[in-house]
């Protein structure tokens, strides 16, 4: 037998050489060995032994029988194939049933599914389970036929019902005990997998009685002979001997109850065996009237790309390396969607794993997206930028870069660095209750004309204008300041600037798109590129956050932040376990609805940092979780996370906690002067119960007890007075009259408190080149020692909250370290080093020279880089770092975007990372100009 078999193999090689199979039906010969379970009870082994076996248990079909890294098991019941199971070692199992149900570890999963190097998907009507790492492919078709393919690495290393894969059919019937037998039932029964839960019965061959009429038997016999006589099958005779298939077909005639379709499984198996050898038998199904059944709306084809077009892949130009297979596919022009064929206009869209029908819309920030042809078509409006400070000096820039900077000084948070129309400065101090922590004590804002005043938002919720405390709400032209929740304030200036300040250190700064690309400071430059967020006043991007933060320091007498701990948990092991467990709520199902809208990872890092850095980690935990919940609420996802035993919020007497309340028109004052421009937003906090309003004492009262605010005066309920012969009376917080006159000015006067106290430093004399400055008592905007100019802050605006007398550098000179220097002698700074005027540095492909304290750089467009590091770390062209532990192959970069036909594509994937016996490696595939290059370590 071997010489004949070898001759057939050599002939197959010759016929598949380049140019040998050029016409219709040619297909590259597969390099994988194939085992098939088909028909009612037939098995075709890797070495092409065919036999019958009707099992009633679980049996080993194939696997790694040397190191036992994986096993493929067939599950039978009453002679019927029920499904396939794959076991990886002793602790992982996945089960695929003929009906498409999938269980992994006892849990239902849906396709597609990837885990531990295994990929489960639906392919042309087949359920396919494959693994490049383990070297196998298993398929179950719609008729319950099984196909198992093994790579040549398993040559002579497998065992089970599919044989031993060594090209010798003579030793295929080797039992689990190692003996050879000629009885297929003795062989197959030996591979039954009994367990304590399931004892496998020994299966016997069925009876051989014939229940088919002679006339039908003749018709079936003639159909079996088609394998030898029909021209459509004759094309493959040189590659696959039809005799064993004809013999098998004839043997099953008496046992089959499906009429003229009884031979069809054998004919299908012959066609698949030919395709395995590289020969496609187009038309065999029609010629033999054996076209396999397909789901409604689909049609059978002898050659279908396994990378079939679906609604989800409509916008992706896939790279398909696998050969075509026979199976069910959609008619030309239609796409597969969840098992049915549809027109492209019927394709749904997917967002955050949830499908949306055609025409559905979503709001994303300030834009609206509509589902069309499986793609989201979105408006392209520029959205407001948000800069956020939370917890222990955690920042989120306008371009969503998260960082921590714990310097103690006054810093420029954000400024219009083109027109200088506004500035926002923060003051940070050591926290009073925790000397190791840094808190934001106040926020100072300088607004555009005609105000030109300094507004200070103080710790505790107070507000000062040019050093004088003012009463809230404050409404002056475009400027509006109002209380939102408890001690929280909201400052609005027109529609372009908004500040939310909670009075305890949490700050949100929102700017309209008119400022995009125009800002500078700790919040970044608002240009959509995270890579240049650490831009300094000198014009260079710093790699270290400490150098970046120090460059925006406004006061000369503050120490630079030299180094800050990247992970306080490493310094406080006692709190590490508590931090990990407590902060895990952010990634728990409690916040699952928000994960697709706001990534929890930066907030999780901040939570661990704060809990470990805080003297009372539990208090900081609640603030950290609240910060993430607030970010979710801003994206329209409201999470009720507080519980009586976890971070319960204690409200003042008479107020109630609301997870989502509105700040608008909740006070007695708002009854007299409703704020029609208030933005209805969702805020967590303490509110008066429905029907009650907050009075000036902080108590919740019914409107009948609210005073009235009229013409700058306060009137108690039921007060009556005469105004120009009109009788006016106060009722329900509103001044009523016999006429319809307006109820006075909508702009309450600022209530001034104690006058600004001027601080001074006693100095009898100043040594040259210092000069003495004495603050005038009659000028609240005077500047003194607190505004000392240095080489680093010379171009930054000083916001004085109180003049300090003392010694300052003479005109034309500035302070550098502890000496006075001429302005033109100031150095430039980069990466913590000083550079003298005229010095040069190289930044990417540009050259920068130090001139007038700033770096003057060439403006070449430099090459950008995207990195894939380790198993799951990615660094985009624009500097975004993210974690994605996907187990499939993904497009790393391509220029096949939109209607662009494209010229290249780079794919990335990890292999062997879930196999203990294999080395994990990264594979990069480069497709360019019709060529393919693969790189792997």
From Swiss-Prot:
GO terms for biological process: blood coagulation; cell adhesion; cell-substrate adhesion; hemostasis; platelet activation. Residues 23-762 form a propeptide. Its main location: secreted. It holds the Pfam family VWD. Residues 825-852 are annotated as: CX. Plasma. It is found in: Secreted; Secreted, Extracellular space, Extracellular matrix. Glycans are attached at residues 99, 156, 211, 665, 856. This is von Willebrand factor. The lineage of its organism: Eukaryota, Metazoa, Chordata, Craniata, Vertebrata. The gene is VWF.
């Amino acid at each position: 037998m071997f010489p004949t078999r070898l001759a057939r193999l050599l002939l197959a090689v010759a016929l598949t050489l380049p140019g040998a199979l050029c016409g219709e039906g040619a297909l590259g010969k597969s390099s994988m060995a194939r085992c098939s379970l088909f028909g009612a009870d037939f098995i075709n082994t890797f070495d092409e032994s065919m036999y019958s076996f009707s099992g009633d248990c679980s049996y080993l079909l194939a696997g790694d029988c040397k190191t036992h890294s994986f096993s493929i098991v067939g599950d039978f019941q009453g002679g019927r194939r029920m499904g396939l199971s794959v076991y990886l070692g002793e602790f992982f199992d996945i089960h695929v049933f003929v009906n498409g149900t999938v269980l992994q570890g006892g849990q239902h999963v849906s396709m597609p599914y990837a885990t531990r190097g295994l990929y489960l998907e639906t392919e042309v009507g087949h359920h396919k389970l494959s693994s490049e790492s383990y070297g196998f492919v298993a398929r179950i078709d719609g008729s319950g036929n099984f196909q198992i393919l093994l790579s040549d690495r398993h040559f002579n290393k497998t065992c089970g019902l599919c044989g031993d894969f060594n090209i010798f059919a003579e030793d295929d019937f080797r039992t689990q005990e190692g003996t050879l037998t000629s009885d297929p039932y003795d062989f197959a029964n030996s591979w039954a997998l009994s367990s304590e839960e399931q004892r496998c019965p020994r299966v016997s061959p069925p009876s051989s009685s014939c229940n088919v009429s002679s006339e039908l038997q003749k018709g079936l016999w003639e159909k079996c002979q088609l394998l030898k006589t029909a021209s459509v099958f004759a094309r493959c005779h040189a590659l696959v001997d039809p005799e064993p298939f004809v013999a098998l077909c004839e043997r099953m005639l008496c046992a089959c109850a499906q009429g003229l379709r009884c031979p069809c499984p054998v004919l299908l198996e012959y066609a698949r065996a030919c395709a395995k050898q590289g020969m496609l038998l187009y038309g065999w199904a029609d010629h033999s009237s054996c076209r396999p059944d397909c789901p409604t709306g689909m049609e059978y084809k002898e050659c279908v790309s396994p990378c079939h077009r679906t609604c989800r892949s409509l916008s992706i130009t896939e790279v398909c390396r696998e050969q075509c297979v026979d199976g069910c596919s959609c008619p030309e022009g239609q796409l597969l969607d969840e098992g049915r064929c549809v027109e492209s206009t019927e394709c749904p869209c997917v967002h955050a794993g949830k499908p949306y029908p055609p025409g559905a819309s979503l709001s994303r920030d300030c834009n609206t997206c509509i589902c069309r042809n499986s793609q989201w078509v979105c408006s392209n409006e520029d959205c407001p930028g948000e800069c956020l400070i939370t917890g222990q000096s955690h920042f989120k820039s306008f371009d969503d870069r998260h960082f921590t900077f714990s310097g103690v000084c006054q810093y420029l948070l954000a400024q219009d660095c083109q027109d200088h129309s506004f500035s926002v400065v923060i003051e940070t101090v050591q926290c009073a209750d925790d000397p190791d922590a840094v808190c934001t004590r106040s926020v100072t804002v300088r607004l555009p004309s005609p105000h030109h005043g300094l507004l200070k938002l103080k710790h505790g919720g107070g507000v000062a204008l040019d050093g004088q405390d003012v009463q809230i709400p404050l409404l002056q032209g475009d400027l509006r300041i109002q209380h939102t929740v408890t001690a929280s304030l909201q400052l609005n200036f027109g529609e372009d600037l908004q500040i939310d300040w909670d009075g305890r250190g949490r700050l949100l700064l929102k700017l309209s798109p008119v400022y995009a690309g125009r800002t500078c400071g700790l919040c970044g430059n608002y240009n959509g590129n995270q890579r240049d967020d650490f831009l300094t006043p000198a014009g260079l991007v710093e790699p270290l956050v400490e150098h970046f933060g120090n460059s925006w320091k406004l006061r000369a007498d503050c120490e630079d932040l030299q180094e800050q701990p990247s992970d306080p948990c490493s310094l406080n092991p006692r709190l590490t376990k508590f931090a990990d467990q407590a902060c895990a709520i952010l990634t728990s199902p409690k916040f699952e609805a928000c994960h697709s809208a706001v990534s929890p990872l930066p907030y999780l890092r901040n939570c661990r940092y704060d809990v470990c850095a805080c003297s009372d980690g539990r208090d900081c935990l609640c603030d950290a979780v609240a910060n993430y919940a607030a970010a979710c609420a801003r994206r329209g996802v409201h999470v009720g996370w507080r519980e009586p035993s976890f971070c319960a919020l204690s409200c003042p007497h008479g107020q109630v906690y609301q997870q989502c309340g509105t700040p608008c028109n909740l006070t007695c004052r708002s009854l007299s002067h409703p704020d029609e421009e208030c933005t209805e937003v969702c805020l967590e906090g303490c509110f008066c119960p429905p029907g009650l309003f907050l009075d000036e004492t902080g108590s919740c009262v019914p409107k009948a007890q609210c005073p009235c605010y009229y013409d700058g005066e306060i009137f108690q309920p039921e007060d009556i007075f005469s105004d120009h012969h009109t009788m006016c009376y106060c009722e329900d917080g509103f001044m009523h009259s016999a006429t319809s006159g307006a109820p006075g000015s909508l702009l309450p006067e600022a209530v001034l408190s104690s006058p600004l106290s001027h601080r001074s430093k006693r100095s009898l004399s100043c040594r040259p080149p210092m000069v003495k400055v004495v603050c005038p008592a009659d000028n609240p905007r005077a500047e003194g020692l607190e505004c000392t100019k240095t080489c680093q802050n010379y171009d930054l605006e000083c916001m004085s909250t109180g003049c300090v007398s003392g010694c300052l550098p003479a005109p034309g000179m500035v302070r550098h370290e502890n000496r006075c220097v001429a302005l033109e002698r100031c150095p430039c700074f980069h990466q913590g080093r000083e550079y003298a005027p005229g010095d040069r540095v190289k930044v990417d492909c540009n050259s920068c020279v130090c001139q007038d304290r700033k770096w003057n750089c060439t403006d070449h467009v430099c090459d950008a880089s995207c990195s894939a590091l380790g198993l799951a770390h990615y660094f985009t062209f624009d500097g975004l770092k993210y974690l994605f532990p996907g187990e499939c192959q993904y497009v790393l970069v391509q220029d096949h975007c939109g209607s662009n036909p494209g010229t290249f594509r780079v794919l990335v994937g990890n292999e062997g990372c879930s196999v203990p016996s294999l080395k994990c490696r990264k594979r990069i595939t480069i497709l360019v100009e019709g060529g393919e290059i693969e790189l792997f370590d």
